[in-house]
């Protein structure tokens, strides 16, 4: 079995961004891949180059006869605090998406000895036969329960994708500033438990940047459990000036519930799933919250039908909830606002790098999908940097930007030498990862 990539990677599409210069899309005939040598660094091996290409495709000499090999597609997995996305490399978007929250039976159920399941994942959480305690193996993007993560991967491979993991290479995303032991634990799980033939671990922010087709940029990621502002130069993240904010989409959901309860609704923590749906369908980010408050409440009123058929109405809480991103004190956080943290990271860069990053601010993460989010961030950054020209760029499906970047990367012929094979892991140990995953 060979682990080479034989499928055509899908180019990322730059959509409705505020920066017009990234709005054009090249035709398939003008999209070619730059596969530089290993010494050029990961970015130059992964970037899509949009230019005319007149050189003929390299052909294999007819004199060289190779044995016919079984070829399989690599699997890309992006495990986040809120959701896990997975699918085969080369596809434009993930084919499977499940909640990272799992269910564990309460102790009295687990002790009955009736051989019932110990962990419920994904669709198994719908109408379970036993009472479940919901838990999440990640805290602010960092894995704290590896046994539960293994249960999630077991479900992904065998129930969702229905594949044999020992037949597919796996590319895994890793959050910024994560412990180095994360990578070693992933290698141990994939190689020793699932017997995968090869694996690679890549930084989430770098993968997000690849989905935009860039080699440098300031990645602003607002996910479910944590937010990051990551400067990247020629494919290399700069951890010393990376900003981390411990508030994100889950905090927005909780704050929305508080606002609705203050307005007379009665939601509990057990109904956060409903509040999450309300957030996605009804909420937005105001360009100017002060002016928005002056608008009559009736103009903001919108109806939402609960699962039991009861109708509720939302007014100003629709946009007030998202103000926590720009004023974290609303949720009793002492950290900087997202826009302030972004400018802080830019100011820590030297002048030349700052100029490059200022024009390449790349949004990603599910929470940035709120209507009005890119425009508001653009306005705040322009206000704080009047002498510069910050440009916020967005993709239409930036909630899956990490996975899409991984799909592109794992498909590239120039990337194939960077797989870590199980035989290499068995011979050299987990530290061999750092030779290929950097």
From Swiss-Prot:
SUPFAM superfamilies: Actin-like ATPase domain (SSF53067). InterPro entries: Actin, ACTL7A_N, ATPase_NBD. Coiled coil: none annotated. Residues 36-56 are annotated as: Required for interaction with TES. Interacts (via N-terminus) with TES (via LIM domain 2). Heterodimer with TES; the heterodimer interacts with ENAH to form a heterotrimer. Interacts with ACTL9. Interacts with CYLC1; the interaction may be relevant for proper acrosome attachment to the nuclear envelope. PANTHER family: ACTIN. This is Actin-like protein 7A. It comes from Bos taurus (Bovine).
